[in-house]
Structure formats: C-alpha cells, structure tokens
Amino acid sequence: MRKKIPLIAREQKRIYTGFLIIMAVMFVLTSAYTEFNPMVLIENGEAFWDFITNDFLPPALPKASRIPGIFESVAVTLALAMSSTTVAAILAFFVALFGSEKVSPFPRAAKYVRGFATFLRNIPALVWAFILFSSLGIGTGVGFVALCITSFAFMVRAFVETIEDVSQDCVESLEAVGASFPQRVAQAILPSCLCGFLSWFLYCIEVNIRASTIVGMVGGGGVGLTLFSYIKGFQYDIAFTIILLVAAM
C-alpha cells in the first residue's frame, strides 16, 4: 500500500492555517475600525479614471523658459540625496563601531547606541522636515538635515548588523597579538564589511532620491517643490511629466 508523503508537515500546516485565519480576522477588524469599504473604490472607479485620462493624460511639457528650472530642481534633488547620504554614511560608520558589542571598546554602551538609532529611524523624514521648518525655514537646508538624520539612523542599524556578521575569530586573533581598536577596525572590520557597507550606501541613495522628492513638496526644495507648485496650480498634465521624470531617476 502506497503512503502519501505530505509536502508540508501537519504541524507546519496548522501554523500556516492559523496564521492566515488570524490575518483574515485582523483585516476584517481593521477595515471595520477604519471604515474601509472596497465597494467605494469600485463605485468611484469611473470618476477616478476620468480624472486620470482627462487631467493627467497625455503628459505635457511646460513653457520652454521653465524647462531649465525643472532640470535644475532635478539636479538639486539628486544632490540632496547624494550629499545627505554621504555625510550620514560617514557618521553612521563611526557610530556603528560603538553600536556593535563585537568590536566596541564600550560594549555596555552598544545597546544604547542601537536604541538611539532605532528611535531616530522610526521618525520619518517628512516629520523631521516639519520639525525643522520652525528653526531653519523653508529651503534645501531643511531637506538636507531631514534626510541626513533618517539616513544616519538607518545606516547605523544596517552597519551594526553588518559588523555583527564578521567572524569573531578574526577579531579575537588581532586582540591576541595586541592590536589596538583602530587597528582591529582597519584590519578586520573594513575588509570584511566593505561590500556590505557599499550595498547599504547605494540602497540608501536610491531611497533618498524618492524621499527628497516628498520632503521637497513640503518646502525642502528640489523637484518636489516644483511638482507641488504645478499640482497646486491644477496643471496636472505638466505635473505628470515631472512625475515620470522622478520615476526615471
């Protein structure tokens, strides 16, 4: 008699089924709490598509005299993303060394460093921009500081996790021969973590290009401010062209 071998163990199947049931119940409860009704989207779908096809499409170009200003705002957005990420990465690297219990000269302080970075990371760049408006005013300075804070907090946690993956044997062997803290960093941490650091750095640049657009819409400068001005002026076809330009960055 042939016996069928289940592809998923019974215990795992029960866990998955229970998880799906919990997620379904949570969806129903949260939808009821927020009064979310998918039928409203379906009923208003025709009006939505009319708005897109009549106001946004086809995309249009602004006046020739304004095109250089748009490209200049795009350059400002890219510069904000690059500069804020670069400054944040340099600061995050040094702070992450103290946030890793494996290499930190003050292991007890590592959890406080990670906790502080987590606190900063949980506050979105848009919120930081609103907080900084009162002291710095509207401009690219606000966008730079807001992006720098969120990027710094994100990369501190990312760099700490990357450092934690370094082999403990490598660090201990350098300690055994009397290597100082800077020597351990230069000989063990950097060679082992450089690729990981670069990956997180490039990822953060990509995220900040999008974030700088959002921050710019509330006064942080760059292409976001230009986009918001066209939306506010009900020039949706030109705004859609700028949206496509942002998507291409």
Language-model-derived ranges and their functions:
Residues 63, 67, 71, 75, ...:
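Alpha-helical membrane-protein architecture signal
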Residues 85-93, 97, 101, 126, ...:
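Hydrophobic positions within alpha-helical transmembrane segments of bacterial inner-membrane proteins
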